């Protein structure tokens, strides 16, 4: 096995830059000569395509796709035409793209094709913490796991060599810690890669049963060939140390192992699938006890057990959540191979809890306050507005996945739910996965209301453009989708637009919508208060003498509203943080004592 994990580059052209993991991935793709790149934004992957878009348009085509399947299909099309293609997404996005991935794994590639998937161990900003390595095994494609930003850069470049050598899509798996950690990265120039032209071979590129039956055995043989390649690849790295115990690991877990047990023998696997069997057997034979340290699922551990090798893993290290040096040390200590960490007294002062809230002036705030007053059953979706599931708005009953709200609402109505049934979905999410269930709802004569929360941006992931903004990822003007036109085109007869800042009109519109028999659509239309620029109007103030501490304004959950030291009949009055207030007037509209007024300029 080679003793290096770095991809060789010309020293004369090297430079060192402080890059975040996602920036390093983008840089690696650009250096690899990528010509076609597509993605759908999703934390922790978003910055990859944003950074690729900063490179010249003459170098590569980049796009925000309407969803992850579309993004992967765009990349597959680029590879069919002989160009190096790139796609990125978060882990749950791979669920959406998996239909294409599973077929593409049989077909293979022409130009190199790399798919970067960013997992979210610890569920910082996702619905789950699924493990992409299991998808790679299911699809029969290799998955590389960099452990730091330098490897993120290098592994992407190496992935193209593997992709073209073995005629396969290659997944590069990142994680939240890797994607959002910054470190020094040695970079190089862009490689000039000539396009191979379109692959005119229907027996390979057309996925029909007759072709697929021939290609499946080739996929199996390819897996075996890649496993053999990994035996001597720089991705497989043996660090010899104490033979009392050895650790097989990869990704960021490798760094944790090196921090807590630098003397241990370590087999670092830069590829989590397929595995280099000979290297693993040789390493296992060289140590007294063998451990696998991996985040989330026991993917490597199970493969090693299937080889008949005695190994210890998830019995010692947690299967749920992120790993850390502390957890790795605790697991090894529980195994009796190293001392436990010294007990450190906790901080005497507990840090102040700051639960996530919608921004001051967020247009979604009024929408969900109105929905709560209707006593409706609300199916939610994925976006900033999911925060309305908690107090004080607490008006969302379900949230499953992108686009689930509308079909969930149809199911609730079909099951006989007596309350009004309302689906709430953001503009970007509606374009991502909301159209098919809306068509289905109309076709199947469902009795539901759909509220499209149109804030003219993909806000949750940092303000990315989509087909409803009229701008491309490079800021170029383009066609702007009209939601009312779409809804009417698929058969929705009752469609209304409303400004959520007009609380009274909003509430009346929602009442009319829920009274309509059939599918009704309300488009709550107002730009996000943060994107493209922060909106800042004249702030408001509360006349303390007029405040009767009814606290109705606090039901908005606005972070600009804070408790006052003054009280009225034992209840705290409210103040407005004028630095945070944007002057939306929502609090003034719900104030029962009419004591909230704009501050005079």
Regions picked out by a protein language model, each given a short descriptive name:
Residues 48-51, 74-76, 97-101, 123-130, ...:
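Short acidic, glycine/serine/threonine-rich loops at helix termini
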Residues 59-60, 118-122, 139-144, 312-316, ...:
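Short beta-alpha connecting loops at secondary-structure transitions
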Residues 2-22, 26, 146, 150-358, ...:
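Flexible, low-complexity linker and terminal segments
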Residues 57-66, 107-118, 200-204, 443-456, ...:
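A glycine-rich helix N-cap at a beta->alpha junction
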Residues 120-169, 175, 206, 210-213, ...:
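Conserved thiamine diphosphate
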Residues 1-149, 240-241, 263-266, 306-523, 533-535:
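Thiamine diphosphate
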């Amino acid at each position: 096995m080679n003793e290096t994990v770095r991809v060789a580059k010309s020293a004369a052209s090297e430079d060192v830059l402080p890059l975040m993991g996602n920036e390093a991935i983008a840089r690696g793709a650009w250096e690899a000569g990528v010509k076609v790149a597509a993605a759908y934004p999703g934390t922790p992957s978003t910055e990859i395509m944003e950074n690729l878009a900063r490179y010249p348009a003459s170098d590569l085509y980049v796009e925000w796709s309407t969803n992850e399947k579309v993004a992967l299909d765009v990349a597959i099309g680029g590879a069919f035409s002989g160009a190096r293609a790139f796609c990125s997404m978060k882990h749950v996005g791979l669920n959406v793209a998996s239909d294409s991935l599973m077929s593409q794994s049989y077909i293979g590639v022409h130009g190199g094709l790399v798919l970067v998937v960013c997992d979210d161990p610890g569920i910082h900003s996702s619905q789950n913490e699924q493990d992409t390595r299991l998808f790679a095994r299911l699809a029969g494609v290799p998955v590389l796991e960099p452990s730091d930003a330098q490897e993120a850069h290098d592994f992407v470049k190496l992935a193209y060599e593997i992709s073209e050598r073995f005629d396969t899509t290659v997944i590069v798996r990142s994680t939240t810690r890797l994607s959002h950690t910054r470190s020094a990265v040695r970079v190089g120039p862009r490689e000039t890669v000539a396009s191979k032209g379109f692959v005119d071979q229907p027996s390979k590129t057309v996925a029909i049963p007759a072709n697929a039956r021939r290609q499946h055995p080739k996929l199996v043989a390819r897996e075996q060939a890649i496993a053999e390649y990994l035996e001597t690849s720089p991705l497989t790295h043996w660090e010899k140390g104490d033979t009392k115990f050895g650790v097989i690991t990869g990704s960021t877990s490798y760094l944790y192992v090196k921090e807590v047990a630098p003397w241990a023998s370590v087999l670092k696997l830069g590829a989590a699938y397929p595995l280099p069997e000979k290297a693993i057997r040789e390493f296992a034979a060289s140590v007294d006890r063998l451990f696998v340290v991996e985040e989330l699922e026991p993917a490597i551990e199970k493969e090693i057990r299937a080889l008949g090798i005695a190994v210890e893993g998830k019995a010692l290290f947690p299967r749920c959540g992120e790993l850390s040096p502390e957890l790795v040390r605790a697991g090894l200590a529980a195994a009796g191979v190293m001392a436990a960490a010294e007990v450190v007294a906790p901080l005497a002062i507990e840090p102040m809890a700051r639960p996530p809230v919608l921004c001051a002036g967020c247009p979604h705030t009024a929408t969900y306050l109105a929905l709560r007053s209707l006593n409706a059953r609300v199916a939610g979706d994925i976006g900033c507005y999911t925060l309305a599931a908690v107090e004080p708005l607490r008006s969302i009953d379900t949230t499953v996945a992108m686009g689930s709200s509308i079909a969930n609402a149809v199911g609730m109505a079909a099951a006989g739910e007596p309350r009004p049934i309302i689906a709430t979905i953001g503009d970007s999410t509606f374009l991502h996965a909301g159209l098919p269930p809306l068509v289905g709802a109309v076709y199947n004569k469902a009795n539901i209301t759909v509220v499209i929360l149109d804030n003219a941006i993909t806000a949750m992931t940092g303000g990315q453009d989509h087909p409803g903004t009229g701008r491309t990822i490079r800021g170029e003007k383009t066609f702007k989708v009209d939601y009312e036109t779409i809804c009417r085109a698929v058969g929705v007869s009752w469609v209304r637009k409303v400004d959520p800042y007009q609380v009274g009109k909003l509430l009346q519109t929602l009442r009319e919508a829920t009274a309509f028999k059939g599918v009704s659509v309300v488009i709550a239309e107002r730009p996000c208060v943060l994107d493209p620029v922060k909106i800042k109007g004249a702030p408001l103030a509360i006349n303390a003498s007029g405040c009767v501490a009814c606290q109705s304004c606090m039901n908005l959950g606005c972070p600009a509203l804070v408790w006052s030291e003054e009280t009225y009949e034992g209840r705290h009055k409210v103040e407005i943080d004028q630095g945070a207030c944007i002057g939306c007037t929502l609090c003034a509209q719900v104030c029962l004592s009419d004591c909230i007024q704009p501050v005079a300029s």
